[in-house]
Amino acid sequence: MLIRFKINEIECEVDEEKEDLTILQACTANGIEIPRFCYHEKLTIAGNCRMCLVYVTNEEKLLAACGIPLDENFDDESIETEIDEILKAREGVMEFLLINHPLDCPICDQGGECDLQEQTIAYGLDTGRFYIKKRAVEVKAFGRLIKGIMTRCIHCTRCVRFLTEIAGVNELGVLGRGYNMEIGTYKKNVIIESELSGNIIDLCPVGALTSAVYAYKGRPWELKNIKGIDIFDTVLTPINYQVKGGEIFRILPRINDRLNEEWITDKVRFHYESYKIIEKMRKDTPSYKIQANKFIELSWKTALKMVFKVLLNKKNKVDLIIGSKINSTNLRIYKELMNRLGSKNYITENGLLFKKFNYDFRENYINSNDLYNVDQNDLVLLCGINLRVESPLLNIKLRNINFGDDEIETRKKIGIIGNKFDWKQESEYLGSTVNSMLKVFEGRFPYCQQIKKSKAPLILVGSSLLSRIAISLQEIRAAFEIASNIKPENVLLITQGANFGMALEEGIFKENFSKGGNVLYSIDSNEYKVSKTINYIIYQGILNDTFENKIDLYLPSKHYFEDFESDREIYVNTFGQRSEIEKLRISKGNKIKENSMIGYIQLMYLNKKEMNRKEKEQKEIKITYRGIKQKEKRQVKINKNLTINNIIDNYYMTDINSRLSKNLMITGQLRKEKKIMEAGSWKNKTCI
C-alpha cells in the first residue's frame, strides 16, 4: 500500500510493503533532521531520550518519532517537526539532560564529537534554572580499554543494547530508577568480556565512555584520516587511522554495510600503541650476529652482498616464509626471486597451517558468499572454527540470525564441531574430534536430518579442522554435496591472515611444506617454530620476538602500510572484495627499506620497469572458467580420534603488534584468568 503524507508541508510517499519505516527514518530519508540521542539504526528502539518528539495531526500529544511506524493510519496525515510546541519541548528535554551533567567540556575527550554539545547549542536554553546539588556517580571500571566517567551519562542505553543484542554479552545494564538510575555492571568491578567492547565508545553520544588509551592525547580536528584495513582478520574490515605528526593517535571504523557495518574489533582499535614501542626497540640498520647475543651493524651494501652469498650458494637449500601482512606486489617479487634461484620451497605464514590445499580454482579459496544476506540462511554448521576469536565480526553477523521464536527448533538449526565456545546458547554440540565430522558426512547425527531439510544452509570450515587432517576444502564440499546435497558455494572457508587468498592467487603455497632446508629466509614472519635443520636465518622485517636470538642476519623493513611504492595498495579479503589502503609513514629511521625495494635489489637483472610491465599484463588478462564439479572418490587415512583444537589460544596476543600492546596484553590476561579490575584502575595506568 502506498502511503502519502506531509512532513513540514512537503509531500512524501512510502510503499508500506517495500519499506518498513518509522517517522524518524522517513524524515531522515527526505532530508529533514530530527535530533536524537538514544536512537541508532543498528540497535533496537528504546525511546529513552525524547529528543525526537514530533507533532502529528489528530494526535493529542507529541510523539517520539523513533518508535512510531508509518502505516495506513498516516495516509493523508501531516507531520510537523519545527513548530513552537516542539521546540519548547526540546528545550525542556535538554534542560533535564543537562541537570546533572558536569562542566567537563574543556578536558573531555569527546570534545568536538559530542552530540550533547552540538544539540545543546541548537536546541537548548541559554540559561540554567537548576540550583540544587548535582548528582555525582562513581567512576566505573570497565577494563584497561574503556574509561567510564558515568557522571556524564545521559542514560541513552546504547551501550547496553549493543552489548546485549549484537556482542552477545549481558554485563552492562540499567541499575536503580529515577534519581538513582545508573548504567553499570551487575557485579561490581567486572570487565566487559567481549572482543567488540570498544564499539560502545563510538556509540556513546557524550563523554561517559571514552578510550582509555587515547585519553588526553589529542583533539579530533587536529587528526588526519588515512584509510586502512583490519589486518588481523580475513574480512579486512575498513578502518581509519587518525594520525598527527607521523604518530597514530586513534583507529576508528569506516562504515561498510556489506562487511562490518560500523563495528571493529578491540584488537585493531587498540593495538596501535605497539608501533611506538616497536620504533624504540628496532634497529634501523642491518645487523649480523658474530656470536651469541652479539650483533654488529652493517651497511646495506654489505648486508645484501651477504644475502646474495647465502642464497646463491648451491649447497644451501632455502626455505622462504612470508608474513601474513605482506601485500600482493611483494608476494610476486619474492616468488620471482625464489624461482630465479631455482627453488619452489616458499609459503606464507598462514599457509603453514594447511597440510593440503587445492588452489587450481579461485572458488576453492575465495568465498562467493559475502554473508551480507546471512539472514536468509536457515541453518548454520561450524566445523573447526571458533568465531569469537577467529573472526569476531562474522560472529556477530551469524549469532543474530533469527530462526524463529521456537527455542527448541532454533537449537536444531545451529551445530558446532570442535572446541566449545560461548557463541549462542541455543546450539547443538556435535563433538570435538575428527570422528564427529565423519559422522556428519555419514548422516549419523539427528542434526544431519536438519541439514538435509535445509533450503539455505551455511557451513563454515575453519583452519583448525584443515590443519588436523590432510583433506582439502574441495573434498569437504564434495562430501557435503554427496551426503546432504549442499551446494559448494554454501561451504565457506574462514582462514587466518590478511594475504592468504592473495598468496594462493600468486601460486605461493607448497603442500606438506617440510621446512627441510638449512637456510630460512623470513619476510616479516615469526609466528612459527624454526625447524631443527635450519643453521642460518635471514630475518627481514620489523621486529622478531619469537626467535630473535637465533637470527644470523637482520634486514630492517617497513610496516605493511608503508611498504608500497604508490600512495595506495589493494588487498583482497576472503570474499574476493577489494579493500584499499593509503600509505601511512611512521618509521623514524631513514635507513629502513621497503620490502619491495630489498626484493628489487636482489633481482639484480630484473629492473622495475619489467616487473611493472608484467604486473600490468597480469591485471589486464581476464580468465573465465567454471569449477569442475567432480565428486572424487579416494581413500584417505585419517586418525578419527584427533581433537580439533582451536588454533588461537589468546585472542589478544596473536602477533607482535598485539603482544607489544600493553593494554591488549593485560586485557587478554585478565579475561583469561578472569580477574577483577579495581575501580578507577585506568587512572593508574600508563598509556604508552
UniProtKB/Swiss-Prot annotation:
Amino-acid positions noted as binding [4Fe-4S] cluster 2 in the UniProt annotation, renumbered to this chain: C153, C156, C159, C204
Residues at which [2Fe-2S] cluster binds: C38, C49, C52, C66
Coiled-coil region: none
A Pfam family assignment: Fer4_NDSU1
Segments forming domain 4Fe-4S His(Cys)3-ligated-type: 85-124
Alphabetical keyword list: 2Fe-2S, 4Fe-4S, Electron transport, Iron, Iron-sulfur, Membrane, Metal-binding, Mitochondrion, Mitochondrion inner membrane, NAD, Oxidoreductase, Respiratory chain, Translocase, Transport, Ubiquinone
GO MF annotations in UniProt: 2 iron, 2 sulfur cluster binding; 4 iron, 4 sulfur cluster binding; metal ion binding; NADH dehydrogenase (ubiquinone) activity
Family: Belongs to the complex I 75 kDa subunit family.
Name of the molecule in the record: NADH-ubiquinone oxidoreductase 75 kDa subunit
Organism encoding this protein: Dictyostelium citrinum (Slime mold)
Lineage: Eukaryota, Amoebozoa, Evosea, Eumycetozoa, Dictyostelia
